[in-house]
């Protein structure tokens, strides 16, 4: 009863504090913004100071309040024991389950992503019948997993099936050319990920020649692509598939280590994989999240798994030094997700020491100090590495504006931030809170007794890890609150509900055993059994949903082959060949002109798909400028004109979109620069980046 009171009071306090924070003004200096941000972007700037405060403050405050209320209600229970009877506990436990059930119904009926939307988005329109059938079908395997004693055989079967799924996903994903599609959403988001890699591969430097929103991953990718044979679409597909398979492997290994029931582990991990990295149903490949932002939290899961199974203290010490370097590497890859990895790892180390030594031990405080120091060291190694690579490539150093360009643009300026509405995120947060609700009471009990923890460390360590990853990764949705953006976190909830089933099952068995004993407590045991069964049913429905999605994706791929839903998004309108795209037409036009009219010299491409065109024509990026896809500031737009002025002896190609923005942002600067050139040719092209015909203007120096 103490824990239920603590949970309710913590939630109520957080809701009240969150409501008060909603009145915090943004205090944005729009006059200053107008001086530096281009009009198109300024119209989409929606700074969310209040929402950011709510997220950061309440994420930290909730567990603190929970633990504080536990200690408060413990003292109250000694003075007023009638407030904390077993009967009241059974009532409030049922009320909690009832509230969660009502919230699920409301979200599926009234939210920004209702049942019909989710049904079509994930379940091919089959919906609830498939969910229920899947939930029923996995009851027997779960029961069998709890009964079997042949652990070695289970492990072998587990990894054979996991390997088959990982190979299946790799083959399907690695066969795709992400440029060869007429789906603008897919190509546009892929291009934002790809062009920095191509630019780095041709000798350009992040922060000097261009700014990259998503971090310094291009340096790592270029190194891998060189091993594969170079920066091209075939190797890029292999790289993406490899990263996604690594993420899937991390989910499988984490589940194998921390689930006792290996069948349940396989079901949860498979559901997580197909709801996240192996989303092979529709064209929802958002490369900026899977694999870019998801890889570091996944690596954190595998690092924690390995550390957990290591028993030798010396091996653990060496491994934790290695982990410090790994997470510095993660920060270098992508700072936003890298910092989540650093926090999760530090939290895990502290939790392990709390389990080992209790809360009164100096060892715990030493562990906290070490975790802070190693986290700072990881950040320092990241910053030093960035500066060394930049200086080695360009002979210059870069500052915070270049290192944290994406963070300062989006979170700092509020670009494309959206208010959070009533949606699925509520259910995902409930899963995170449920994970902490399993852990925090047991930690509080151990702290009160002044002893080291003697409970189920395996289950609770996993729940803690997933909850911290979930709350950390939720920051992405807080900023970019598109209804579907929160779907990238469903995999965390799937793994959590699997672990919750494993935790609830022994409780249910205990209550059923008590029901068989004839005494006055049978009604209470029955009430507890009903509540626990309801929790398990809710969790089973989530697992049923994830399992049905995985099954339908695999069946669709196996049954329909090259005509599967997934494959159809890579079929060009022209049907000429699998790798054909309309971008090839533009590249051919530019190549033909340069050979006939420009002595074979590649013009500077100040166009939207510049990296693709240069790749097709086997040319390097021969100018330093910010790509149109990342134009946020006036200075970004001016980089096109700057490169025209820097070298007045070379031809250049510019498109309608760029000219429109340049004319709006710096018309005089453009007119002055273009005086040194004459228009040589106009290419008209049906561009996938905008409906209708686009024009591409080829300018040559006047002396030519």
Across the structure, where does each feature detected by a protein language model lie?
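Extracytoplasmic
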Residues: 123-126, 337, 387-395, 537-701
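Transmembrane catalytic cores of multi-pass membrane glycosyltransferases
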Residues: 10-66, 169-219, 227-243, 250, ...
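Hydrophobic/aromatic-rich transmembrane helices and adjacent perimembrane loops
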Residues: 119-133, 340, 479-526
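Start-transfer (signal-anchor) and selected internal transmembrane alpha helices
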Residues: 1-15, 71, 75-99, 123-173
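Membrane-interface junctions at the ends of membrane-embedded or membrane-associated helices
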Residues: 1-4, 72-85, 141-152, 257-258, ...
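Transmembrane-helix signature of polytopic, membrane-embedded enzymes
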Residues: 251-280, 315-320, 399-400
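Signature aromatic-anchored transmembrane alpha helix within multi-pass, membrane-resident enzymes
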Residues: 372, 376-380, 453-454, 507-558
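Transmembrane alpha-helix segments characteristic
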Residues: 89-104, 270, 452-475
């Amino acid at each position: 009863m103490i824990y239920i009171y603590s949970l309710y009071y913590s939630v109520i306090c957080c809701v009240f504090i969150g409501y008060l924070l909603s009145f915090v003004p943004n205090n944005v200096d729009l006059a200053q913004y107008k001086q530096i941000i281009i009009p198109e972007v300024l119209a989409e700037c929606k700074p969310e100071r209040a929402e950011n405060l709510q997220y950061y403050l309440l994420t930290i405050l909730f567990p603190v309040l929970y633990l504080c209320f536990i200690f408060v209600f413990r003292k109250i229970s000694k003075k007023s024991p009638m407030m904390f009877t077993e009967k009241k506990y059974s009532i409030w436990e049922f009320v909690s389950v009832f509230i969660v059930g009502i919230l699920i119904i409301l979200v599926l009926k009234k939210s920004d992503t209702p049942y019909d939307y989710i049904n079509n988005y994930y379940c091919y329109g089959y919906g609830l019948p498939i969910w229920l059938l899947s939930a029923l079908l996995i009851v027997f395997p779960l029961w069998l997993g709890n009964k079997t004693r042949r652990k070695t055989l289970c492990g072998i079967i587990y990894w054979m099936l996991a390997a088959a799924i990982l190979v299946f996903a790799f083959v399907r994903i690695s066969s795709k050319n992400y440029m060869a599609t007429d789906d603008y959403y897919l190509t546009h988001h892929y291009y934002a990920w790809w062009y920095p890699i191509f630019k780095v591969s041709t000798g350009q430097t992040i922060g000097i020649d261009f700014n990259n929103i998503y971090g310094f991953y291009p340096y790592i990718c270029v190194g891998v692509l060189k091993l594969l044979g170079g920066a091209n679409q075939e190797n890029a597909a292999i790289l993406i598939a490899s990263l996604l398979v690594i993420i899937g492997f991390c989910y499988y290994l984490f589940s194998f280590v921390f689930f006792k029931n290996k069948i349940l582990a396989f079901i949860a991990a498979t559901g997580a994989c197909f709801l996240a990295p192996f989303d092979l149903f529709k064209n929802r490949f958002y490369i900026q999240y899977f694999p870019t932002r998801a890889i570091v939290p996944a690596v954190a899961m595998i690092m924690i798994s390995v550390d957990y199974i290591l028993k030798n203290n010396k091996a653990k010490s060496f491994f934790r030094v290695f982990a410090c370097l790994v997470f510095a590497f993660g920060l270098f890859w992508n700072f936003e997700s890298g910092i989540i990895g650093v926090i999760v790892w530090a939290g895990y180390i502290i939790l392990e020491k709390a389990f080992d030594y209790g809360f009164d031990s100096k060892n715990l405080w030493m562990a906290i100090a070490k975790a802070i120091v190693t986290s700072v060291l990881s950040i320092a190694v990241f910053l030093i590495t960035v500066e060394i690579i930049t200086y080695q490539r360009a002979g210059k150093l870069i500052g915070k504006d270049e290192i944290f360009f994406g963070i300062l643009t989006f979170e700092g300026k509020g670009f494309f931030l959206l208010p959070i509405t009533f949606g699925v995120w509520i259910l995902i947060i409930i899963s995170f809170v449920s994970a902490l609700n399993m852990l925090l009471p047991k930690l509080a009990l151990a702290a009160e007794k002044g002893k080291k923890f003697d409970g189920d460390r395996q289950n609770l360590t996993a729940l803690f890890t997933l909850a911290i990853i979930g709350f950390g990764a939720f920051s992405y949705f807080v900023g970019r609150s598109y209804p579907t953006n929160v779907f990238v976190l469903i995999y965390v909830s799937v793994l959590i509900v699997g672990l919750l089933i494993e935790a609830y099952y022994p409780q249910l068995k205990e209550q059923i055993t008590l029901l068989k004993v004839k005494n006055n407590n049978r009604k209470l045991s029955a009430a507890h059994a009903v509540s626990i069964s309801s929790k398990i049913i809710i969790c089973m429905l989530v697992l049923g949903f994830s399992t049905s999605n995985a099954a339908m994706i695999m069946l669709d791929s196996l049954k329909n082959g090259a005509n599967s839903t997934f494959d159809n998004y890579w079929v060009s309108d022209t049907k000429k060949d699998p790798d054909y795209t309309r971008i090839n037409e533009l590249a051919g036009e530019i190549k033909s002109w340069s050979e006939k009219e420009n002595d074979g010299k590649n013009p500077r491409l100040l166009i939207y798909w510049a990296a693709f065109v240069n790749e097709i024509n086997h040319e390097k990026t021969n100018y330093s400028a910010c790509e149109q896809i990342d134009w946020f500031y006036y200075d970004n737009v001016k980089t096109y004109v700057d490169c025209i002025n820097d070298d007045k002896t070379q031809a250049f190609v510019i498109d309608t979109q760029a000219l429109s923005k340049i004319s709006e942002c710096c018309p005089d600067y453009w007119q002055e620069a273009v005086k040194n050139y004459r228009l040589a040719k106009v290419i008209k092209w049906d561009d996938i980046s905008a409906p209708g015909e686009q024009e591409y203007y080829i300018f040559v120096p006047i002396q030519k």
